[in-house]
A protein has these predicted regions:
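Histidine-centered, metal-coordinating catalytic motifs and their short helical/loop contexts
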Residues: 99-140
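Amphipathic alpha-helical interface segments
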Residues: 1-107, 138-176
């Protein structure tokens, strides 16, 4: 597990905890799974064709795709809740963060709808109704959502982690 990355998740979890204390273990759990998935993606990419085609690797790939699927669902619900709390006035966000959380929610929603409902997201009518999983050599598990358009779990996790790290900085500077 990339320890530095996991430490960033631990540190950033307090930003979500300001909004809802239960979000702290949720963010930390997402971070732990994120680091595990990155480790497994890196390990898999180092295998030769024969090794990557084994029955064991097929099972491990199924596990990675499934865990990535659940990671996306959990992360989406976290982001959706942050966005909803801000929109209903239940919490405040530092300047500029409301737009960032809304943009991240839309990005995640573009993937979440076809992987859960198996239909096209209304905002993206030309997308595929089903997002088929694939492997991006540089980023691990990805989903093909439209012609020439893929969303990787790693891309979403990087964006969520960056958002939370920056949110924590924004909350800290607001208090000073």
């Amino acid at each position: 597990m990339p320890d530095d990355r996991f430490q960033h998740w631990i540190d950033a979890s307090s930003a979500a905890g300001v909004i809802e204390p239960f979000m702290i273990p949720l963010v930390q759990g997402l971070g732990r799974f994120d680091c595990h998935l990155i480790h497994e993606d890196v390990r898999f990419s180092a295998l030769n064709h024969e090794q990557s085609s084994s029955l064991r690797e097929s099972r491990l790939l199924t596990d990675r795709v499934t865990l990535s699927y659940f990671w996306v669902l959990g992360a989406y619900e976290l982001v959706r809740t942050l966005d909803q709390r801000w929109r209903t006035g239940a919490t405040t966000l530092p300047d500029g963060f409301a737009n960032r959380v809304a943009a991240l929610k839309r990005r995640m929603e573009r993937l979440r709808i076809p992987i859960t409902k198996m239909e096209t997201a209304r905002r993206f009518p030309t997308d595929n109704p089903i997002a088929y999983p694939t492997i991006s050599r540089g980023f691990g598990i990805a989903w093909h959502i439209a012609q020439d358009t893929y969303i990787t779990r790693r891309e979403l996790s990087d964006q969520l982690l960056d958002f939370l790290v920056d949110l924590k900085k924004g909350q800290t500077s607001k208090r000073l």
